[in-house]
Design a protein with these regions (language model features):
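N-terminal leader/linker segments that precede catalytic domains of diphosphate-processing enzymes
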Residues: 1-287, 291-303
Length: 303
């Protein structure tokens, strides 16, 4: 996980999975030519979109490279990528800096280095949409993948200011204690991951379920019992006012933090003890899209 810059507009200082917006260069035939293991048609079916689905995978891998320095790719012939060659590592550090600065396309790095992005090993895991009424909304697809062997994660010292490998249970416990800030969708994703004993089990389950990932669009309310999140299917979900994400917190970041502090159970319960099945199909609205992937070492246990 990486820690967001303290000056970020959205929950600065929180720990998140690497991610960001899908760029135009993430899609199209040129991008598909550097991807292996999944076609645009296959990706689009999984996401429930007409076309352009592969761009989400491309964005996830690009953002993981930009923010965490991990590159889920390989050359068709040759040694493992970034596995101890100092000259190669220095070259990719420089390429990463150029991509982050906007002077070099990630696509061009892959093409010039003869890389194939391992999109077939990255599995669609979760879909969250920011509650209606929020001043800034995100339509976010989450992915899981094994970390590439031999590579060392490193934050970018720009959008992110720290990185850590941490087990889901430790992250959730740190959140409960107040010394590891994470937000509600991250909490729920970590709760889901924590149910698996190993990364291998998680990846196998994610692959098997990737064609039926539900969309979760919470609604947030404040009443005499405090701040609560209601999910699709919960009693009162359709009655929640949507003109403000949290009635007692007009500042969006304060609202997000209040909700996330309340969601302090690691048994799947939501804030206020409300839990329910999510939607089975995406809504018709299409706010901006962000693509954070999740990653764990491929053989490591998940304590």
């Amino acid at each position: 996980m990486v820690r967001r810059n303290l000056q970020s507009d959205f929950v600065g200082g929180a720990f998140v999975f690497p991610g960001g917006a899908v760029d135009l260069a993430d899609g199209g035939a040129e991008a598909e030519s550097v991807c292996r293991g999944r076609s645009d048609a296959e990706a689009s079916i999984l996401l429930g979109v007409d076309s352009g689905g592969l761009a989400y995978w491309m964005a996830a891998l690009r953002e993981t490279f930009e923010e965490a320095g991990l590159l889920l790719a390989e050359r068709p012939a040759g040694p493992a990528l970034l596995a101890g060659d100092p000259e190669e590592e220095a070259r990719f550090v420089a390429e990463r800096a150029r991509v982050n600065a906007g002077t070099r396309r990630f696509l061009d790095v892959c093409r010039d280095e003869s890389l194939q992005l391992l999109v077939g090993e990255v599995h669609y895991f979760a879909h969250w949409i920011t509650p209606m009424g929020a001043p800034r909304r995100y339509d976010t697809r989450f992915f899981v993948a094994a970390a590439p062997p031999g590579q060392q994660a490193a934050h970018d010292a720009g959008e992110t200011i720290a990185e850590t490998w941490i087990s889901p249970r430790r992250a959730l416990e740190g959140h409960r204690k107040g010394d590891f800030e994470i937000i509600f969708p991250t909490i729920r994703n970590l709760q889901a991951i924590s149910r698996f004993a190993t990364s291998r089990e998680l990846l196998e389950a994610a692959e098997a379920a990737s064609s039926s990932v539900p969309t979760i669009e919470p609604r947030v309310l404040s009443d005499g019992n405090g701040v609560r999140i209601v999910l699709p299917g919960d009693e009162g979900y359709d009655d929640v006012r949507v003109d403000r994400p949290v009635g007692v917190a007009p500042n969006f970041n304060d609202a997000v933090r209040a909700i996330s502090r309340a969601a302090n159970h690691d048994d799947g319960a939501t804030a206020g003890g409300v839990s329910a099945p999510p939607l089975s199909a995406p809504p018709t609205s299409a706010p901006p899209v962000a693509e954070p992937p999740l990653a764990e070492p491929s053989e490591g246990a998940i304590p």
